[in-house]
Design a protein with these regions (language model features):
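Short functional hotspots at interaction and active-site rims
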Residues: 1-191
């Protein structure tokens, strides 16, 4: 089977990371709202579990995650727009990095906008390079695993009682990535 140029670059990227020559981070946004996504629950016989869905606020989260569980995240009560993403990247890389850092992003409109493209040269001067995933490949973006873990495993039903409590729980998890909350990526197959 012939491998595409993108697959070869993807493979080289991880070889460079394994050699310690670059740092690779995966970036993405997700939303958390009061309607829980708990797919199943266990209870004792004759015990009833109730989760009352409520319409409440939505907490938007944008962040970067490495395979070593190093994360940098930002939250907003507004939708994530290009300006927000650019400001986050600028805050994350305020000056030239010693070791090159590759930021892997999906092809969302926010990531492909003119503003994002206009910033790439300045970021590259700081040793930050943006790598876009192939289209329709969200499974390759490791931070998607973080969002799933948060929504399906780490958030508890009682965290959805109020928007304030949900916000607090989400921020607690985000602050604990790498210490209390870890994902094992070493066995993951990428291609």
């Amino acid at each position: 089977m012939k491998r595409s140029a993108k697959q070869l670059l993807w493979s080289e990227l991880f070889d460079l990371e394994a050699s310690g020559l670059v740092e690779v981070y995966f970036g993405d946004a997700s939303g958390f709202w009061q309607t829980p996504v708990v797919a199943r629950a266990w209870q004792f016989a004759n015990e009833e579990i109730r989760i009352v869905p409520k319409r409440g606020g939505r907490l938007a989260v944008f962040g970067f995650l490495s395979k070593a569980n190093v994360a940098r995240t930002w939250t907003s009560k507004k939708s994530i727009k290009t300006r927000f993403v650019v400001d986050c990247i600028d805050e994350w890389v305020p000056e030239r990095l010693g070791k090159p850092r590759v930021l892997v992003l999906d092809n969302a409109q926010v990531n492909r906008s003119r503003l994002m493209q206009s910033k790439r040269e300045a970021w590259e001067e700081k040793n930050l390079y943006v790598f876009y995933l192939p289209t329709y490949s969200p499974h390759l973006n490791l931070i998607e695993t973080l969002w799933r873990q948060m929504k399906y495993l780490w958030l508890k039903p009682e965290d959805y009682i109020s928007f304030e409590r949900l916000t607090e729980a989400v921020k607690k998890i985000l602050d604990g990535i790498g210490s209390q909350y870890k994902i094992k990526f070493k066995d993951r197959v990428f291609i």
